[in-house]
A protein has these predicted regions:
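Contiguous alpha-helical segments
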Residues: 1-44, 72, 90-110
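Histidine-centered nuclease catalytic patch
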Residues: 24-33, 42-81
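Short, non-ligating residues that shape and space the ligands of small metal-coordination modules
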Residues: 52-53, 86-89
Length: 111
């Protein structure tokens, strides 16, 4: 299906970048990752549904839980592309706490 093709294409490129550019371990099976992402259907952090379109802020992305480690089954979660960019190298607890601070500080502006 279209979501599966999108995910397979995107992560074959990410695998090459991880290995060649970043010299990171890649111990993921693309078929298993693809099925897991499509089954999950939404960002593990924000809960927003995945959008299977290049350039979408909600396109699925593989986040490394521990940014010092590679792409292994015990070190990944599936998140939206912009959540992954925003989180960067932060651990999940720090990222969520920062988001809470921003939401609290800006709550008067956006109701």
């Amino acid at each position: 299906s279209e979501p599966r093709l999108f995910v397979r294409h995107k992560f074959s490129k990410q695998k090459s970048k991880a290995k060649l550019v970043r010299n990171l371990e890649w111990a993921l099976d693309i078929d298993k990752v693809t099925e897991a992402i499509v089954e999950q259907g939404r960002c593990a952090i924000s809960g927003r549904p995945f959008v299977y379109k290049t350039g979408s802020i909600d396109a699925p992305s593989i986040d490394r839980i521990d940014s010092e480690r590679g792409y292994t089954p015990d070190n990944i979660m599936f998140v939206g592309a912009h959540i992954n960019i925003m989180k960067g190298r932060l651990d999940l607890e720090t990222f969520v706490n920062l988001c809470k601070d921003v939401a609290k500080f800006r709550s008067n502006e956006f109701g």
